[in-house]
A protein has these predicted regions:
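Vicinal oxygen chelate
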Residues: 2-9, 13-21, 62-131
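Acetyl-CoA-dependent GNAT
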Residues: 41, 59-61, 121-125
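Long, continuous compositionally biased terminal/linker segments
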Residues: 6, 55-60
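Short low-complexity, flexible loop/linker segments enriched in glycine and/or proline
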Residues: 53-56, 110-112
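Short hydrophobic/aromatic beta-strand element in the GNAT-like acyltransferase core
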Residues: 46, 55, 71, 94, ...
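Alpha-helical elements of the RecA-like P-loop NTPase motor core of helicases
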Residues: 27-28, 81, 118
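Core segments of cupin and vicinal oxygen chelate
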Residues: 10, 17-55
């Protein structure tokens, strides 16, 4: 993996995604805790807290694109491609990089312990709202 003199490009730990049975009920719970709903789709929602830098994705029962995971966020799209290529060259099984409908781009992989994680480019200003 990357050494101290070889930065990975990871900006921060950005969001956690959890599976929920009832998206609307979960949104109500988390907005009551002070989170802001910024993306709402039929099968998933995204909420932010604070200055919009920390997020929670609520994955409904019909959401099939990904399962529960945590995500490292990158400041630029190139960083995602660089880490994707580096991990692949090291023999790590990584998914393809996808451009998403919310302006982000990402890929998924498992760490050596079997935990799912996402490497995500987040556009300047954060994930745009569709609400």
């Amino acid at each position: 993996m990357a050494s101290a003199d070889q930065p990975t490009g990871v900006d921060r730990l950005g969001h956690v995604a959890i599976r929920v049975e009832n998206v609307d009920r979960a949104v109500a719970f988390y907005t009551d805790l002070g989170m802001r709903l910024v993306w709402h789709a039929d099968d998933w929602c995204y909420l932010e807290v604070g200055e919009g830098r920390d997020g929670l994705a609520l994955l409904g029962p019909n959401y099939k694109a990904a399962g529960p995971h945590f995500a490292f966020h990158f400041r630029d799209r190139t960083g995602v491609d660089v880490i994707h290529d580096r991990l692949k060259a090291q023999g790590v099984h990584v998914g393809a990089v996808h451009d998403h409908r919310d302006g982000t781009a990402s890929f998924y992989l498992k760490d050596p312990e079997g935990n799912w994680l996402e490497m995500l480019y987040e556009p300047p200003g954060g994930i745009p709202s569709n609400c």
